[in-house]
Amino acid sequence: MDLFSLPDFDGHEQVVFGHDRATGLRAIIAIHSSALGPAAGGCRMWAYPSSDEALTDALRLSRGMSYKNAMAELDLGGGKAVIIGDARAHKTPALFQAFGRLVDALGGRYITAEDVGTSTTDMEQVAGVTPYVSGLKRASGEVGGDPGPKTALGVFLGIQAAVRFQLGRGLEGLTVAVQGLGGVGHPLCRLLAAEGVRLKVADARAELAERVREELGAAVVPVDTLLEQDADVFAPCALGAVLSAQSIPRLRARIIAGAANNQLARESDGELLMQAGILYAPDYVINAGGIINVAHEYRGGSTEAAVHAAIKKIPERLTAIFERARQESRPTSTVADQMARERLQAGRRA
């Protein structure tokens, strides 16, 4: 395998493969860009079928983090870590300590945090061996902790902005289909329900869907039919590549706005959404609430009010993207990519 010729290799600055025989750790850390600051992005633990697929995910996710941090106006670059393993069966404190040593060896070039398959508890183990970690448990009133609810808040505000732009109205009485009901999807459903939204939900873990049904009165639908449900907004909050040439024709919603990373299977899928008249909120713009929280925690000296003020800029950025895309007759994803690259390039010149 030639790493430098892989389709998802995008001039990444560094890719680190880590293995610890004693704990069974197999991890990849990808640093896409440090033009704006140290690379920051979460650590995902997933049972990848192969190391090639894990590498592809790390490359794509780290690039997305560069764009996310740039668009959120953070002084952070983009990186991501993936641990190959079943998060429900293979976690041990020693494994995350070994991962922490791998992070520490980079000397601050990469700052980690929790992501899919990892938690604040796991990050506490990492923090025992390296200072280059965020998303840690904090005392009441301190900035930090699980970034999921902050991601959900940003997505909620982004959905409001997309609905105003596309439909010219508020949320009450609309139907939102939410895919994935974990650490972001569930709190997002709470925020939507409080605004009078009708919820249709799906998750591969039936117990999570049932929990949301009992708490919020959501309609539970099979995972494989959610795209085809009558809904005003589709909010993907699980894994990526959900929007493709095969899935887009099945969509019934007029707006796509969710928390999942890398929602487009291919860059060209943004064009397909535009042709279908579907407004797409670029994932790394709408889901930046979590990394904003992580950044404020890591830098220190911040407040919850400052974090919320930064997250409340997300709808403004989305609206600017929507307006520019409409004026230029280009996909919102293309416009967002260009804006992110421009900020990264400016950082390299500085």
Language-model-detected regions and their locations in the chain:
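Predominant activation on well-ordered alpha-helical scaffold segments within soluble catalytic domains
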Residues: 55-62, 93-104, 124-127, 152-160, ...
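Adenosine-phosphate binding glycine-rich loop
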Residues: 163, 254-350
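Rossmann-like adenosine-cofactor binding region
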Residues: 206-286
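N-terminal ligand-binding/catalytic initiation module
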Residues: 1-141
